[in-house]
Structure formats: C-alpha cells, structure tokens
Amino acid sequence: MDVTKKNKRDGTEVTERIVTETVTTRLTSLPPKGGTSNGYAKTASLGGGSRLEKQSLTHGSSGYINSTGSTRGHASTSSYRRAHSPASTLPNSPGSTFERKTHVTRHAYEGSSSGNSSPEYPRKEFASSSTRGRSQTRESEIRVRLQSASPSTRWTELDDVKRLLKGSRSASVSPTRNSSNTLPIPKKGTVETKIVTASSQSVSGTYDATILDANLPSHVWSSTLPAGSSMGTYHNNMTTQSSSLLNTNAYSAGSVFGVPNNMASCSPTLHPGLSTSSSVFGMQNNLAPSLTTLSHGTTTTSTAYGVKKNMPQSPAAVNTGVSTSAACTTSVQSDDLLHKDCKFLILEKDNTPAKKEMELLIMTKDSGKVFTASPASIAATSFSEDTLKKEKQAAYNADSGLKAEANGDLKTVSTKGKTTTADIHSYGSSGGGGSGGGGGVGGAGGGPWGPAPAWCPCGSCCSWWKWLLGLLLTWLLLLGLLFGLIALAEEVRKLKARVDELERIRRSILPYGDSMDRIEKDRLQGMAPAAGADLDKIGLHSDSQEELWMFVRKKLMMEQENGNLRGSPGPKGDMGSPGPKGDRGFPGTPGIPGPLGHPGPQGPKGQKGSVGDPGMEGPMGQRGREGPMGPRGEAGPPGSGEKGERGAAGEPGPHGPPGVPGSVGPKGSSGSPGPQGPPGPVGLQGLRGEVGLPGVKGDKGPMGPPGPKGDQGEKGPRGLTGEPGMRGLPGAVGEPGAKGAMGPAGPDGHQGPRGEQGLTGMPGIRGPPGPSGDPGKPGLTGPQGPQGLPGTPGRPGIKGEPGAPGKIVTSEGSSMLTVPGPPGPPGAMGPPGPPGAPGPAGPAGLPGHQEVLNLQGPPGPPGPRGPPGPSIPGPPGPRGPPGEGLPGPPGPPGSFLSNSETFLSGPPGPPGPPGPKGDQGPPGPRGHQGEQGLPGFSTSGSSSFGLNLQGPPGPPGPQGPKGDKGDPGVPGALGIPSGPSEGGSSSTMYVSGPPGPPGPPGPPGSISSSGQEIQQYISEYMQSDSIRSYLSGVQGPPGPPGPPGPVTTITGETFDYSELASHVVSYLRTSGYGVSLFSSSISSEDILAVLQRDDVRQYLRQYLMGPRGPPGPPGASGDGSLLSLDYAELSSRILSYMSSSGISIGLPGPPGPPGLPGTSYEELLSLLRGSEFRGIVGPPGPPGPPGIPGNVWSSISVEDLSSYLHTAGLSFIPGPPGPPGPPGPRGPPGVSGALATYAAENSDSFRSELISYLTSPDVRSFIVGPPGPPGPQGPPGDSRLLSTDASHSRGSSSSSHSSSVRRGSSYSSSMSTGGGGAGSLGAGGAFGEAAGDRGPYGTDIGPGGGYGAAAEGGMYAGNGGLLGADFAGDLDYNELAVRVSESMQRQGLLQGMAYTVQGPPGQPGPQGPPGISKVFSAYSNVTADLMDFFQTYGAIQGPPGQKGEMGTPGPKGDRGPAGPPGHPGPPGPRGHKGEKGDKGDQVYAGRRRRRSIAVKP
C-alpha cells in the first residue's frame, strides 16, 4: 500500500511515499517531488515502517529520509538496510527522472519497496524487475546493458566520459561537478528504457542507466540539467547545491545516469555528500563523500566510472565513517543513496579488476549501502547497523547514515571481477556478513582483512587500516581538543588567581582611603591642626597605617592649600578609552558574504533590458527585408550603402528615376550611397514607388539578403528616393504620388507659409473685396474651402475616407505610413477635396468651422492665404490650378516639417490619397492646405503640428464632393518632392494629409455662397456629429476640465473679454489672413460686441464655464469640454458677427483635416523620444485623463484638432491657447517622421526650429494661454469663458496635453507653451499656481504663472497674460473677441475665415501644451527650460494623469524604445516601422535568449 507522508520541507510540502512493497510508484516521469524538492527536508522522517530510519533529517538533506523511505519494509528491513530499499535511494534523487518509479518519487525511492525492498539489495535490480533479487546474474545483466548501451563496450571509456562531461548533456550536467572523479555516465546507458516494472521500483535506482526504464527516458534529466540545480531535484550537482536538492541525493545520483556526481561535493552539508555518490552508476564515486555531513563528503569524488576514487575524501573526520567508503560501500550514506539508485557500475572498464574497491559495482545501487541518504548528518559516524538504528536518531538524522551501512554490508562480490555483487544481508546479516569488508577491499570478496564491520557504511570497501586510520585521526582530533581545553582551563585558572589578587589589593586600599577621608574631614573641621601637628611630629617614621595616612593627609592638605590638588578635571580623560573600539572597524571585512549574490541569477530579468539592444541586431534587419521595412528603408540611405553592393537592385532604381520626377533629384544626391544602396534601397522604394511592383524588386534578393542590414537598407530608400518613390506614387495607388505632390508643395509651402502666405494673405485680403468681387477672384477663392466646408455636408467626407490613402505617406516616409491611417478619416473628406479650393480656408477650418461661416464667401479671397491656402488649395481643387499651386506651398510646410515639424510629410500625405483617387486627389491637395494651415500657417513650421488638428475639419470633408475639383490633387502628387523633407520623411506621416477631409470644404468652394451660407454650413458642420466628434474629439479631451469651471482663468484671473477680443482681432489682423481685408470692417470691438452679446456670451459661458474649471483632471474628459462648447454655435455667432462686420471668411478651415493625418501619436512620440525633448514625451503621458479624449484621437488627435483649429484660427477663442496646444502634440507627429529623422540628424537645428516655433507669438500664445486652465484648480466650475478656456484648455490641455504629450511631447513641448498658457493664465491663476505649485506643469508654470509670465503672461504671451490676467475675469466677450480676432489674424487662421467659434476648441489646444509649456515657459530657452523642468520634476510625468495617458501611448511608447533601435535614426522615418520591426526582433532575440536559457536549464 502506499503510505504517503507529507512533510514540509523548507516550506514546501513534500510527500514521502512510503510504498509498501505493495505499490511501486513510478516516478518516471517527473522529477521527484519528494523532498528533494526542497531541499531540506530536514526531517523527512520517513517514518516508514520500521525503523523509520528516520534518516530523515539529514539535514534535511533531504536525504530524505529517504530513509528507507522506503517503503515498506522500511519497516522491516531495518531501515538502512532497507536502505537497499533504497530508502536512501536518493529518494530525492531525481527520482525524478529516474524511474525511480518507486521512489514514489518520494524521497526514498521507496527504494526498494516493491519486492525488492527486501533488505537485500533489491536495488541491485536495477532494471530490476520487480524482482528484488539482486542476483549476480542481474548485476551481470545490468552491466551488460550498460556496456551494450554505450557505443563501445565500455561505456565507461574515458573518452565517452569526457565526451559526456563536455557537452554532454550527458547528464548530469554536473559532470561531476564534484570532484572530478566522478565521471558522468553516458546518458545512453540510461536508456535502456527497459521498463522497470513498477514494481521494480526499487530499481528505480537503477538508474543504472540501463534501466532508466523507459519512463525515465522521459526524464532523464540527466544531463541536460545543469548541474546541480537542474532540477532541483536534480541532485546532481546537487552539489552543493545540494542543499536543495537536498542533497541530494539529489544528485540524485544522480543525475541520472550517472553522473550525478558531482554531487558530491555537495555541500557537505547537504551532506550530501551525497552528491557524490551519485556518481551514478557506476561511478561509485562519490559515494562517499558522504562526507559526513560535512562536506564531507563531498569528496565524493567518487570517481566515476568505476573509479573508486572516491574514497571518501570526505573528511573523514566527520563521521568518518561515513565518508569513506568511498568505495561502494554505501559509504556515505548518501552515497549509498545514489548507489542504490544508481548502482554504480564501476564500469571503470568493466574489466577492471574487481579489486578496486570502487569497483564494487555496487552495481546495485543499493549496495545497500547506506541508503541512508545520510547525508550526513554528521554524527553519522559510522554506526553499526544496530547502532545505526539507534544512532540514527542520535545522529539525528545524521544517522543517515550509515545506515546504509550495511545494508548489510554490501558485500560485494567481485563479479567479473569487476562487479561485485554485494549481497546485503539484513542488518542482522551480521555486519560483516563477511561481505562487506572483503567485498569492499579489492572486491576480493573476503579481502584479507575480512569484512568490515557490518555497520561500516563502506564496510565492503574499507580496509581495517582505513578504519583504524579514521579512528586515529578522530582520537587525535579529540586529544587536540582535550589539550586545548586543558590549556584553556589553566589560563582561566591563572586569570582567576590574578583577579583575586587584584581584588585583595583593592580591598586593602579602600580602608586607607576611608581613613584618609576621615582625617581630612577632621582637619577640615578644625581637628586637622592637631592632626597636622601630630603628623609633623610623627612624620613618616611610624609605619602604622594611621601614621602613614596622617602623613598623606597632611601632604594632601598642603597640596590642597597650595591649590595643587586641582587635578580633578583630569577625569575627563577617561573618555579616551572608547577609542579602542575603533578596532572594530576590521569587522568590515565580513563584506565577503557578498557571495550571497547568487540570487543574482534573477538578474537575468535584467537581461530583458539587454534584449532591447539585440533588437537593434541584424535580425531586425531581416524583418527589414520584409517589404514594409523596405519602405522605411528609404531613410536607410546609409544602409543603402551596403545594399549598394546589390547594384543589381540598383537597376530597379532606374525605374525609380521616373518616379524621381524632381524629388528624386534630391535623393539622387543621396544616390551616391544609392549605388550601393540602390539595389536594396531602390528595391525598397521601388516597392513604394511601384506600389508593390518596384517594391517587389526591393524585396528581391537584395532586400532579403540585406535583410539584416535591412535597417541600413532603409537608408537605401534614399536611393529609391524619388525615383522609385515617384513611380511608386503613380504606380502605387498613387497615394505615394499624392504625397509626392505634397512634397513638392512642401518646399513651396515652406516658403509659401512665410512669404507666400503673406502674399496669399493679401489675396486673402482681396477676399473681402472678393465678396464685392466675389464674381471676380473671390469667386475662385470662395470655391475653396470656405463655403466648401459648409457647402459639403460632410457626406462627402465619406469619400474623404479614400483620403485614407493618405497613408501613402508611406511612400514618402515609411515611418509615417502609420500616420496616414488617421488621415484616413479625413480622407473621407478627401473626395470632397476637389472642391478643395475652399481648402485654403481649411486651415482655419476647424476653428474656422465656426468662423468659417463668417468667412464663407470672402474666404475665397483668403484662399489667397495661399500659404495656408496651399494646404487649402487642395480643397480649392475646383480651382484645380490654384489648388495645385496651393498644394505646392503646403509642400513647403511639409518641408518645413521636414525641417522642424513632421508636418511636411503631412501635407504630401493628403495629396497622396487624393492622387490615387485622382478626383479625390484634389482634396488631397486641400489636405495639404489644411496642413499648411496648421503649419501654418501662422505656425508655418510649427503649425505643422496644427495640421494634425485639421483632421477634425475632416468632417467638412463631406463637402468634399465638390472636392471633385480636387484635380489639383494632382499637384498634391508634387508632394513627392516632399522627399525634400527627407529629414522629415516623417512628412509621409503627414500623408495623413489625406485628411482630404478638409477637401470637403472644397465643395463650399463656391465662394459665391454668402458668408451666411458658409456660416450656416459651418454651423451645421460644426454642430454635425462628425465635425463635432472631430473637434470635440480632439479638443474634447481638454473639455473634461470644464467641471472646474470655477477658475475664471487658467491663472484664476477673471477672463478679460476685451483682452480676448482684442487678441482675436489682433490675431486676425496679424494673421494677415483676409482679416485685414475684412478687418477694415471688423474691429475687436465688433467681435467683442458679438462675443458680448448675451446670447453669445451665455453660449460661451455655458460651454466655457463648465470647462472653465481649471480642473485639469476633468481634462481627461476633455472631450466633454470641447463637446460642451458648441463650436458651431460659437462659430456661427462669431462668423455672423464677422459677416455682419463684412468679414467673410473662406472656409479654408475644412482643409484643416488634412493636417490630422499628420503624424500619428506614436510617430510624434517616437520623434520626441529621439529628440532632446524626449523627456517631454514621457511626462505628457501623465495626462492620463485626457486619454478619454483619446477616443476622439482615434480619428483625430487632439494635436491634429488643435493644429487644425490653430490653422483655422479656431484657436483664437479658446484663446490662442487652445488650437495651438493640440497642434503641438500633433506637430511632433508631423515631425515624427521627418522630425524624428530630422531631429536625429539635425537635433540642434530641429531644436532651434522647435523652439522658435514654440516661441513664435502665435504658437506661444496658443500654447501658453490654454495650458493654464489645465491647472488642477478649477474644480469650482466657474463658467468663465476663460475658465472654459481654462477648463477647456485644461481639459484640452490635459487631454490635449496628455495627448499631446502622449502624442508626442515634442508637440507638447511646443505646446508646452500651452502649458505655459496655463501658466500665463495661471499667472496667479489656478492653473499657474495650482498647477504651478502643484504640478509639474504648475511648477514650471508656477513661477509667475510661469508660463504666462514667461510667455508674456498672456495666453498669447503677446498679450502677456491676456489669458492669464484677462482670462481670470468672467469671459470678457470684448476681450474674447479681440483675442479671437488677434489669434485668428496671428494664426492667419482666420485668413480664410474667421471662425472665432473654433477658437473655443482651440482652448483645449493649450492644455496639450501644458505638459510642455513649463519647459518652454521661457521661449528664450525652451530647451533649457524643458531640460530643467524634466530634470527637476520629471515633472511632466509628475502629472498623475500621466500614467493614464502614458498607458495609452505607452504601447506605442514601447516602440519608441524600439526607437533606439532607432539608431537607424536617420532612417528614423523608417525607424518607426523599423522600430516595430526591431521590437519584433528584440522579442525575437529575447526569445532566442530565452530559448538558450531554456536549453541551459
């Protein structure tokens, strides 16, 4: 029956199973559970029947008890003998692995249990059928098996052993970890597979390899495991480890198969000795180490194969008894364990003369010996069998011991001379059984000396002289101790005598002291004189103490009189004594314990980090081979060099030339690398250009082979560069083409934004006349965005979806490809894009939406705003021609992006999608416009961030239908040049530009439509769920803050509407957007008046108030705030105001959407991460709350919206802050592709640009103002407009910020102004203070409203706290109007249209910035500020929100890390994808490592 005991060892529960012979358990498949497990079972008593043999203990050696553990018999047999039962049997042994079947796994193999359990060695059985009989025959069989198992007959051959040790898996790793002696046994032996019957169980031990019965095989840990550890179970090694493993046995002998060895050494402790033994099979080895306990053993040594080696090295001392034996003898108990199981064959060449003791085959494991796992308890010293039994306990477990002893002596017979069978008789068998010793020695069977005492653990292998020697040594040791004690006692005695003497002296002196005291006392009392006289007379002549004291007293008195006695202070000196303590310093040496470091292994986890580096490794490159990577490859130029070898691929490059159309030229220069790169690079681009066909070539061998280099290959892309790219554009869906168009535009746009815009602006101005002249130019412009947006219900937006092609961006910047996705939505707008003409207005679009209405007709003229218009041009699509022209400008922005913002790519992107659609293409152009608007226009490069926001306008896309005119989209194709934005290949990101959505505005293109129409359209559009979702979505995030409403201003100041209005007006004027045209008719007063209208004000308040709540937290819900504002309403109001003023703003706004595509948040993040601002990125994360707005992001990023609004001029209301803020984040994305590369390649330049952008009044104002709101405060939810702004900002900011930050701090950085805005608002304002003091933002901002002050204190900074100071008050509609006007002007957002309304959305923008704003609190040194801020606060993260935010971006963030792989940095654009790839690679590498690791274990 099985009895199972459960012990807890080391906290683990071990179950020992004692199997009654009845059952055998098959460990077979698993490593034993038993105690080994822990190692120490300390106790383990096995209980077992009989005897119990607790063995146990064994240190917990886990010997496990084993003890008989075995089973059944345990009882009977007396344990140890039982031992053969294997109790020892390593119970733990790996039983595991080995069949051990029995064993029950439990420690003990149970050893024999099973029939074998008989005291004899059933073990011998090895395969043991159930038979216990360990007949010699069986031994012979086993030997035969072992031999047959090995290739050579002697598997013990040294070579085999070496081989095993070397690589072998051969088990046991350990390869003899221990002493060298043990050799591992070849694994093969093990196979045998013979199945041992379960019954054989005992066998189990049989490790003998042979057996190992099939089950084992399964385990057979054997090798494999690394030593010791290896399974825990695995003894082996055990070795010290042993401990665990428990020793044991661990080795369990064996590693299987032999080799457990090593064990030995096992810690001694572990007593194991064990270890040793192990040797497995044959190796007797070990054995001994037994070592008693102590260390002992260890030794173990055991030689392997038959080498007896072993001898116990163990210190004999200990336990001596135990140790020894080495020989088979059980010797060490633990040994025996192994033996038992292992039955070591000595193998040593089978031929070896039996004489070697080792030789004892001990074939059976049992050897009876010891079974005891014995580990030794120390004590163990040998015990006689009986003694053992008794001793066992005494030994406490030590007993382990020997117990095995015997087993009756193993007597070993020399069989084959080499093996001896040891019959073990029961204990009773009389210790000698004669066998023991004789067998032991020389295996001569009798051995001249006769058997060793039955109780001798290694009785069969020890000679009498060995025992004698052991005893002698022991006695010597004892004598040494005795003498030492005697000497000590003598010393103590002397010390005592000395002490007594001192005590006596002290006592004798005390009396004198007393006497003296009395005398002095008397003298002092006047008695002294007489005494003095006496002393004088007496002098010292008298010997009496009294006289002496008198003399002394007199002397003292004199001294005292003389004041000489004053020495008293001296006492302090005593303190010095402590000094000695200093010596203790030495203890410091204990540091040595450091070794515990072993736990270090866990360190591997750290490896994961290292894995990151691997990501960089070529493997990733391979992925690069993948088509996708190839595209990224473009950035690869450097890589291309290598690929250049692939000259062949270069051929594809030729194809590229067509694509080159111009842009190729630039890359052509890169071409030089191209030659090399051409093959690969070209191939890559080819893919893009061809849209697959070329790509194919790219994929061709060149890329594949280079795969690893793939990264470089990416650089190769330059080679592809224009050529393939061009082609790809056309070939590809054309999307690439679209981007291409953008690209060209990008360059123009770049300039355009600045100069052109100005010019355009003029035209824009004309726009006003346009109304008059509507028939004339205005008409054209009109077509563009302004009306378009309203015009197109946005249904076209659906078409816009094609905009998605924006992805084409890929062609431009593979990295950005992803970004395109977002544009996709705008893409829908794309179809409308043709009408793109309105596109120009697009920029203003988002914000414009509301304003757009006003701008409507007039906007046409704003169209001129060409610069932005350019982006808008796409929308103007109708104009087709103009659209193209415009797109050109956008291109510039693209380039601009390349320089500072990824924006560049964005514009191209939009065209790209349109390109394919052709019709839509036009929208694409518009998309550009939109982007431009973002880049804006006022922001020009910086606006680029804004572009993203444009995405929101996407909704207008519906109008897009008119967009069909989109033909201009073709110009978009020019985008290809965007290549120029190389640095900003990210521009591809912009491909998002596809946002075609803006295109929709195109429909409105009919500038003719009156401002009313536009207004209505915008209003509808704005109000429409689609647009709202965009606007709100983006801005929304900030919205949440709304709740805090209380804060009137971010700064906490009341919002000054006058300030705002003036701001708006000035903005409109500064923007030079048709504002001036209209501005004549519009004045800040006008806007103010409009804003102040109760209905307007109420409207603003209702939305803004809530938002107002600085509560940045609400920011999370930011969407809500944004949503809360009815931009349509606001825009309609403002527009109506404007229109009433005679201001008609184009609908340019719509184009804005393209911007959205801009960079993806991830891209932005990547870019930022790569940039010095990377700190910013992380921090932004905090705005977790904004995450909510994130939804909006899905289609449009807050940044996108913000930028869109920004470009549209929408931002003004929110106060400049809003729009910009969001854009900021987006911007980075825009930049991400280009920026990332750009930043990487031109970090300084980029930084300068970024800073300049951020510092630009427009951006700053946007960035700065809004951020304030985010400030925590605001809970009160005042309904100040500003508060709205603030809350909105805050929400927005928060959201935006988080977004932006999340999106990319880079933008955020710029936005940081936004944060700054908060600061400005927060001059004293909640945000500034609350945030300032409180939050990282606050901190930055905190001082002086931080941002606000630094930023001129105004949301717009220019106003210097306009928002800050002004916002504090209730919304001052005048202020608001002014601000809106100014903002719009400044941004040029209103150029096309004055969507003041959008302004509100803008607010959210600011929030985005906050994260960064701090950093930029002073534009003068944004970088420094950012650095300081981050260093000081890590602040950006500081915002608790961060985690939330970060979480969302986080994933992408991870890629960011991949960014490092970014090394390809230049390839950066590709880098993004590459990063992903890298990541994969990393993982891959990680896996490899893991795999390796797995193997090692």
UniProtKB/Swiss-Prot annotation:
Region (Disordered): 1-154, 167-186, 562-1011, 1209-1234, 1261-1316, 1434-1497
Keywords: Basement membrane, Cell junction, Collagen, Disease variant, Disulfide bond, Epidermolysis bullosa, Extracellular matrix, Glycoprotein, Hydroxylation, Membrane, Phosphoprotein, Repeat, Secreted, Signal-anchor, Transmembrane, Transmembrane helix
Span list, region Nonhelical region (NC16): 1-566
Comp. bias (Basic and acidic residues): 9-19, 1472-1481
Post-translational modification, as annotated: The intracellular/endo domain is disulfide-linked.
Matches recorded under Pfam families: Collagen (PF01391)
Disulfide pattern: none
A Gene Ontology cellular-component term: hemidesmosome
Sequence ranges on the Extracellular membrane side: 489-1497
Compositional bias segments (type: Low complexity): 604-635, 661-673, 735-748, 774-796, 936-946, 968-987, 1289-1312
Segments for region (Triple-helical region): 567-1482
UniProt region (Nonhelical region (NC1)), positions on chain: 1483-1497
Membrane topology: Single-pass type II membrane protein
Compositional bias annotation for Polar residues: 57-96, 169-183
Biased composition range(s): Basic residues: 1486-1497
Annotated function: May play a role in the integrity of hemidesmosome and the attachment of basal keratinocytes to the underlying basement membrane. The 120 kDa linear IgA disease antigen is an anchoring filament component involved in dermal-epidermal cohesion. Is the target of linear IgA bullous dermatosis autoantibodies.
Entries under PANTHER family matching the protein: COLLAGEN ALPHA, COLLAGEN TRIPLE HELIX REPEAT
Miscellaneous field: Both the 120 kDa linear IgA disease antigen and the 97 kDa linear IgA disease antigen of COL17A1, represent major antigenic targets of autoantibodies in patients with linear IgA disease (LAD). LAD is a subepidermal blistering disorder characterized by tissue-bound and circulating IgA autoantibodies to the dermal-epidermal junction. These IgA autoantibodies preferentially react with 97 and the 120 kDa forms, but not with the full-length COL17A1, suggesting that the cleavage of the ectodomain generates novel autoantigenic epitopes.
Assembly and oligomerization: Homotrimers of alpha 1(XVII)chains. Interacts (via cytoplasmic region) with ITGB4 (via cytoplasmic region). Interacts (via cytoplasmic region) with DST isoform 3 (via N-terminus). Interacts (via N-terminus) with PLEC. Interacts (via cytoplasmic region) with DSP.
Entry's disease: Epidermolysis bullosa, junctional 4, intermediate: A form of epidermolysis bullosa, a genodermatosis characterized by recurrent blistering, fragility of the skin and mucosal epithelia, and erosions caused by minor mechanical trauma. JEB4 is an autosomal recessive, intermediate form in which blistering lesions occur between the epidermis and the dermis at the lamina lucida level of the basement membrane zone.
Name listed for the protein in its UniProt record: Collagen alpha-1(XVII) chain
Organism of provenance: Homo sapiens
Gene: COL17A1
